Amino acid sequence: QMIGEKTTCVLINTPNNPTGVVYSAQTLTRMADILTEKSKAFGHNIFLVSDEPYRDIAFDGKKVPYPAAFYPHTLTCFSYSKSLSLPGERLGYVAVRPGCEGEDILVDMMAQISRFTGHNCPPSIIQRAVGRCQEVTSDLSVYETNMNLLYDKLTALGFEVERPGGTFYIFPKA
């Protein structure tokens, strides 16, 4: 209902900050169907921007589905600062799904936006280090251990809490 004729993109975050919700394949399929339907109705594609800095922090062995696998007009944003435990480092990428309408223009436009808004390249040493760590992750199990401890304590105190499926956030009902 909130997607109107002027809607050009929808932004999602999975696993979600601050709730820790991980969107299921079923949810992403339904979202893709709605975006496809609305795109046809309005005569223009609606892009899906998927913000995925917490992709590698999922609990209970849960696999986080790739939203780009469900919808062709997806831009994926990723940050290494979470998966490699590099707090404060702003190093990541934006990927345009191959075949996405206007993919060449989008890539050029993102490069220009990055320059105009003052985003600078991270230090060379960080770029080189991350380049060599593509198949490596930090021990992220500490986040699940901490989440379980905090979840158990909060619920024992009577707080209503949705058990997070990922991230290092927990969102008690106020």
Briefly describe each language-model feature range.
Residues 8-10:
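Short SAM/SAH-binding signature in class I
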Residues 13-16, 114, 134, 174:
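Short, histidine-centered active-site or binding-site loop motifs used for metal coordination
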Residues 160-165:
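Short beta-strand
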Residues 72-144, 148-152, 157-159:
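Conserved core segment of the aminotransferase class I/II
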Residues 2-6, 18-89, 98, 104:
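Active-site pre-lysine segment of PLP-dependent enzymes
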Residues 55, 62, 142, 146-150, ...:
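Catalytic cores of transferase enzymes with a strong primary signal for eukaryotic protein kinases
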Residues 168-174:
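Conserved PLP-binding active-site segment of the aspartate aminotransferase-like
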Residues 15, 52-53, 166-167:
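Short, well-ordered beta-to-alpha junction loops that form the rim of enzyme active sites
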